[in-house]
């Protein structure tokens, strides 16, 4: 999603872009209750990813979402191909979108990459989730993006 086409980015730039009609105030309020709530809703991960992209730190959410998709791959060959792609983009040392994981987790992935299972990236995904929950999620809740969306939803709800 490019910044030019992102509805949340346009809304933050005071353009006349409205949130999707099926995004509710209740959902936006749920995001502030817990990181788990944010990630479990339809639009939460999308808005959070847009925020992280604006911060130039979206590799964690992109990796997390890619892992969610990866876990659903049934075909062995597709899984192997996708696992190698995930490794090259996010796990390989010095890769442009390298995520911050410990060497033990990285080594386990390297050992399992030739015959990857659905859970091959599970530990790395948990680590990334924890980083997001502790670091960028509190900043997101205080961000102009979230505050503006919340205010817009509240004013739309008062009609």
From Swiss-Prot:
Note the InterPro entries from the entry: RGS, RGS_sf, RGS_subdom1/3, RGS_subdomain_2
Any one GO BP annotation for this protein? G protein-coupled receptor signaling pathway
GO CC terms of this entry: cytosol; nucleus; plasma membrane
Q: Where is the RGS domain?
A: 34-150
Alphabetically ordered keywords of this record: Signal transduction inhibitor
PROSITE patterns listed in its UniProt record: RGS (PS50132)
Q: Which domain of life is it from?
A: Eukaryota
The GO molecular function terms of this record are:
GTPase activity
PANTHER family for this protein: REGULATOR OF G PROTEIN SIGNALING (PTHR10845), REGULATOR OF G-PROTEIN SIGNALING 13 (PTHR10845:SF32)
Q: What does this protein do?
A: Inhibits signal transduction by increasing the GTPase activity of G protein alpha subunits thereby driving them into their inactive GDP-bound form. Binds to both G(i)-alpha and G(q)-alpha.
Q: What is this protein called?
A: Regulator of G-protein signaling 13
User: Which species?
Assistant: Homo sapiens
Gene name?
RGS13
């Amino acid at each position: 999603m490019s910044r030019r086409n992102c509805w949340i980015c346009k809304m933050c730039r005071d353009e006349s872009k409205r949130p999707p009609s099926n995004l509710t105030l209740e959902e936006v309020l749920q995001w502030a209750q817990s990181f788990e709530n944010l990630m479990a809703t339809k639009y939460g991960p999308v808005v959070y990813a847009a925020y992280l992209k604006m911060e130039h730190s979206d590799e964690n959410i992109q990796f997390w979402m890619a892992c969610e998709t990866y876990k659903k791959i049934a075909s062995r060959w597709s899984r192997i191909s996708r696992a190698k792609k995930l490794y090259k983009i996010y796990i390989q040392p010095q890769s442009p979108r390298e995520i911050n994981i410990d060497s033990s987790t990285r080594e386990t992935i390297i050992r399992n990459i030739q015959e990857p299972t659905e859970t091959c990236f599970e530990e790395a995904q948990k680590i990334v989730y924890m980083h997001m929950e502790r670091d960028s999620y509190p900043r997101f809740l205080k961000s102009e993006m979230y505050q503006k969306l919340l205010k817009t939803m509240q004013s739309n709800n008062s009609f």
